[in-house]
Swiss-Prot record:
One of its GO terms (molecular function) is protein-macromolecule adaptor activity. It comes from Listeria monocytogenes serotype 4b (strain CLIP80459). Homodimer. NCBIfam families: PRK02315.1-5 (NF002644). InterPro entries: MecA_C_sf, Neg-reg_MecA. Belongs to the MecA family. The N-terminal domain probably binds unfolded/aggregated proteins; the C-terminal domain interacts with ClpC. Enables the recognition and targeting of unfolded and aggregated proteins to the ClpC protease or to other proteins involved in proteolysis. This is Adapter protein MecA.
Length: 217
């Protein structure tokens, strides 16, 4: 498992599916077994105590992302208020019975992909594109077939990132695949999340970013 200190308040975990198996878990456990999900979470927090000076006390914002070869988990000290429904406000001081009940609810909401099946008409799918340099962003803005994308350009730690959303009322799976293929001609898929960019990045061009870049450059 990899542990990265993003900043004073945020830690990122990356655990590969192979590492999961070596720890006695499998993907089915993580997605559908709440007790196993909770056990994995506390294992990660216990390991964190030895790797980083990061106290999990107080409200936490926890975001889980499933990648091709593993799981990425962001743990941020924060007070959640109006941030949406992808996180859960949970105070952790020790793994006592009350905290475990809260973690159980947290993991059910964040690890269980079944909830994604209930997306409404206004929900969107998200993709983060990392550019090698700003010239690639300019080139992408002139590409065709991306007119209905919702895009916002950020600067974060010296790099440029495009937050791309696919409105579900305009993009089916085939259209999304085609759009992503075009996007990947100009950049790389990033492991960052829209939440991380919104919290810690700097907005260079707000929605619609590609249209504004094309207009100015």
């Amino acid at each position: 498992m990899e542990i990265e200190r993003i900043n004073e308040d945020t830690i990122k975990f990356y655990i590969s599916y192979l590492d999961l198996e070596e720890r006695g878990f499998n993907q089915e456990d993580v997605w559908y077994d709440r007790e196993k999900s909770e056990e994995l979470f506390w294992d990660m927090m216990d390991e964190l105590k030895y790797e980083e000076e990061f106290s999990p006390e107080g409200p936490l914002w926890i975001q889980v992302q499933a990648l091709k070869h593993g799981l990425e988990v962001f743990v941020t000290k924060a007070t959640i208020g109006g941030k949406g429904e992808d996180g859960f406000d949970v105070t952790l001081s020790s793994p006592d019975e009350l905290a475990e009940e809260k973690i159980e609810k947290l993991l059910e909401e964040n690890f269980n992909p079944v909830k994604k099946e209930a997306l409404g008409d206004d929900d969107t799918l998200e993709f983060i594109l990392e550019f090698r340099d700003f010239e690639d962003a300019i080139s992408l803005s002139r590409a065709t077939g991306l007119e209905n994308l919702v895009t916002k350009l950020y600067s974060y730690q010296g790099k440029y990132y495009l937050n791309v959303e696919f409105p579900e009322n305009k993009y089916d799976e085939s259209n999304i695949d085609n759009a992503v293929s075009i996007l990947l001609e100009y950049g790389l898929e990033s492991n960052l999340t829209g939440y991380m960019l919104a919290e810690y990045g700097k907005v260079i061009f707000d929605v619609p970013a590609l249209k504004q870049i094309r207009k100015h450059f």
